[in-house]
């Protein structure tokens, strides 16, 4: 059964933000979804505008 978890990408490695029930060496598929993809349609802004705002937030706070 598929399970969705959040991970952060650091130094070329995806690091899960919660415990993952996998055996050492076991393979898993990763589906990448950006924050702008997740929020598209919620805000009344174009995808380009959302990406620009997220880039500005990341530049200032380093959180995206």
Swiss-Prot record:
Organism of provenance: Archaeoglobus fulgidus (strain ATCC 49558 / DSM 4304 / JCM 9628 / NBRC 100126 / VC-16)
Family label: Belongs to the UPF0165 family.
Pfam family, one: AF2212-like
InterPro entries, per database record: AF2212-like, AF2212-like_dom_sf
Protein name as catalogued: Putative antitoxin VapB4
Function: Possibly the antitoxin component of a type II toxin-antitoxin (TA) system. Its cognate toxin is VapC4 (Potential).
Keywords: Toxin-antitoxin system
UniProt signal peptide: none
Keyword Protein transport: no
Gene: vapB4
Top-rank taxon, per record: Archaea
